[in-house]
Amino acid sequence: MMKSLANAVGAKTARACDSCVKRRARWYCAADDAFLCQSCDSLVHSANPLARRHERVRLKTASPAVVKHSNHSSASPPHEVATWHHGFTRKARTPRGSGKKNNSSIFHDLVPDISIEDQTDNYELEEQLICQVPVLDPLVSEQFLNDVVEPKIEFPMIRSGLMIEEEEDNAESCLNGFFPTDMELEEFAADVETLLGRGLDTESYAMEELGLSNSEMFKIEKDEIEEEVEEIKAMSMDIFDDDRKDVDGTVPFELSFDYESSHKTSEEEVMKNVESSGECVVKVKEEEHKNVLMLRLNYDSVISTWGGQGPPWSSGEPPERDMDISGWPAFSMVENGGESTHQKQYVGGCLPSSGFGDGGREARVSRYREKRRTRLFSKKIRYEVRKLNAEKRPRMKGRFVKRASLAAAASPLGVNY
């Protein structure tokens, strides 16, 4: 199908594209030996820099025809047609006005060479610029240095009025756009005037005009101190009024100017209240300690009462009494309000059923640790023994060999000893 399509296209035009076989070939690439249309040529030769360097030839759109000129001599040799141009040109099926001769339109059969100013040279130039080391041109550098204005530090000097005016004009012309304009300065001055509440036309800007003199500062500090004193007095009056309120909620009106004496009396009252409250707390604690009484038994009377009734314990044997760190017994009797109750003191927060008294848990823990220690030790011994046995076993090419087969292989006559 591709061949028939190529033949069909070739019948209408000079040559079909070797890549897409759909359009007329516009370029011939000698490196690829292919006729390509415009789109295929741009696609193929823009893939990489190597493909961009391929030399290509632009094909003609019209079929060449040999034109005879009247002024040509018979001795002049005829034009030679390129070798690659043979074999694919076709004559037109219909006459194209061969009777008319147009001397202005002359078709050259020779394909012109690609000029140096082709588009491929642009790519080469770009690659050279990318990989090229910059060269310092002294002429260009001098011109650049002359164009640049070097900043200079100038010391103030006494100048005349004409020089000052000229410099101001030059500065305005050179630094135009860097400094604020006159309109901006006027707006800024108006804003400052509104902030200060007065004009800036006066010549002196002293501290007195701005309201920051020493006398006024002293007055401000004095006013602040007086306000603080009044607030303290008001607070003290409120405190005394709250303390002197009656049960009905009425507040008696009393005018007192003795601030220090009243302050001292209030402090004394507060200290008295604190001392009285502390004494009450101590008394309550003492009463609580007095209420908690330990039971004191008369051992002689108890022994005489239980003389012939046997042991007082239900099990028949006295229980084991363990003392904790604080020295209190594990079982104690406390009397509260005339009634005696039994309380069980659990030592260290452990229950009696945990076996702490007889060392049950400690014994179990010690047995577990001993068992674990011996198990690890026996495990190490077992692995060491296996390692030694493996090292002593005979090997052949890294593998274990049975001793019988080794002895048979060692004997020259195959006799096992």
From Swiss-Prot:
GO molecular function: DNA-binding transcription factor activity; zinc ion binding
Binding-site list for Zn(2+): C17, C20, C40, H45
Compartments it resides in: Nucleus
Zinc finger residue ranges, B box-type: 17-59
Entry's family note: Belongs to the CONSTANS family.
Recorded GO CC terms: nucleus
Protein name stated in the entry: Zinc finger protein CONSTANS-LIKE 16
Sections of the chain in a coiled coil: 212-239
Region: Disordered, residue numbers: 63-105
UniProt keyword list: Coiled coil, Metal-binding, Nucleus, Zinc, Zinc-finger
Domain CCT: 361-403
Keyword Transport set for record: no
Transmembrane segments: none
